[in-house]
Amino acid sequence: MDSESVHEAEIPQRRLRVGVLGFVVLGVLAIASVLMVLFAVPMNTRYWGIFENFLDLDVYRHGGSVVVQGLPLYDGPVLKGMMFTYTPFAALLFTVWAVLSFKQAIVVWTGLNIAALFAVIVLCWKFLGYRLDAKTYAVSALATTIFLFMEPIRTTLWLGQINIFLLLLIVWDLGRDETSRLRGIGAGIAAGVKLTPAFFWAYLFITRQWRALVTAVVTFAATVAIGFVVIYNDAYKYWTGTLVDSERVGPTDAPSNQSVSGLIAQLTHTPTPSRILVLVFSALAACLGLGAAWVAHRHGQKLLGLTMTGLTATTVSPFSWGHHWVWFVPLVVLAAHYAMVSQKRWAWVAPFVFLLPVLNWSHTWWDPSVIPGTDRFVGMGLFMFVPPEYLRIPTVGVYLWIFTLAAVSTLVLFGWKKWKIPASDAPAPVTTAA
């Protein structure tokens, strides 16, 4: 560990430096966010309105119902042609939702998602050394409202997805002090529900967090074992075949597949991109992202290390739909934190650089045949825009470019410039080492 580094856990408790003007700005942005969520795509628009979908939540419910009824889980669609793509352990968890009506599930699930988003933001401030006082909670509530218009968050709520819960589980678990005996159990459970979080094992390995790594792997193995014990046939089918069936997920060249494979498929205009290209660029992205995570961890920036790992996992995953990128939430919080401690006004550009491109910008394709009952198809997120050919590279892979910017910024600030975060709220300027 660099002797000049300041660990987040070692920073005396700070106070959020948000005055009247700051609250006014946050309040205006929060109101604008709510209006955009409700009316940019009119909330009563069939299928596309914020309260008119929840397809994935219904799939979760029906997957749980299939388990309760003792029927095969992976032999065919569980709802409207939709396959159940999660683990047997996840299906067991979803049995709880099978007892609720669809409308009841929507209300409870949405409320819990918003509460989980608020909890993630509060935990970010906590792990960055801020006091959890009334001001921190107020700022977190306003930030939660602003982030509702972030595309990964809006789409997660719109579909009834599980991403925010997994984000909360990992941030709470791996953001804790490394001396915590059960640290790693949350990451193991998250991987047991959805395999992508297993990527955090690589982060624990390169940062030599052996106890957390072992705990995560053992916990994951326990979730697999539970699946075999309770629904053996489904577990056997999943782990011996269904797991690698990419056709159950979706087309690789879908615009909303914001991963390396999706970007290559889009740029080469093919649903089956070259495996060699995908492997090479995925490996490069993994090295870049994990390298940034390692540098952040080495310089005591644990939350930044976790965030870079989460962004890297979504980048290199074969399928990373827009709603998987919920790690933009801690990224923007981190950018705001670094702007506050840098004491330079221009640093406040950073949170907006990371936030604006990932908002739920939408456009309309006038084609009545696309969605029965409506006269338009509403694409959400910059990646759904149909740009001229010369603008395809910056738009179709916009989330990957945000990841790249975050990784390079981390390497430059903490790897090259050796940025030293002030250890208190003292007005001393932030310095860098040559």
Where are these regions (language model features)?
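Primarily membrane-embedded glycan-assembly and transfer machineries that use lipid-linked glycans
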Residues: 2-183, 207-322, 378-395, 414-434
